[in-house]
């Protein structure tokens, strides 16, 4: 939503302002199996899973791997980016 869009804009602006000394990137996770979704109703969870092209909830380890990539030298030419890890849910019409 709005907060993710604000973070994405901030990342782009900061990356341009402080490069090449520091790389700035972010991760935008989708529905992830955490304590936070335990309070979600079963119906809402089912609907969100159904609206996700990969038809499942993500695992915290999957987000950790995305972050690990951004911290590694493998992403040394990546800056100003937001890696969306949401099972294909965003953007959907």
Regions found by a protein language model. Give the residues of each.
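Alpha-helical substrate-binding/gating segment
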Residues: 64-76
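A short C-terminal helix-loop "cap" of Rossmann-like NAD(P)-dependent dehydrogenase/epimerase domains
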Residues: 38-52
């Amino acid at each position: 939503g709005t907060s993710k869009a604000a973070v994405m804009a901030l990342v782009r602006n900061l990356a341009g302002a402080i490069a090449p000394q520091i790389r700035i990137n972010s991760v935008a996770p989708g529905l992830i199996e955490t304590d936070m979704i335990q309070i979600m109703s079963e119906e809402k969870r089912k609907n969100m899973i159904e609206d996700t092209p990969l038809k499942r909830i993500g695992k915290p380890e999957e987000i950790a791997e995305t972050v690990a990539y951004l911290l590694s030298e493998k992403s040394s030419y990546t800056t100003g980016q937001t890696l969306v890890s949401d099972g294909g849910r965003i953007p959907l019409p």
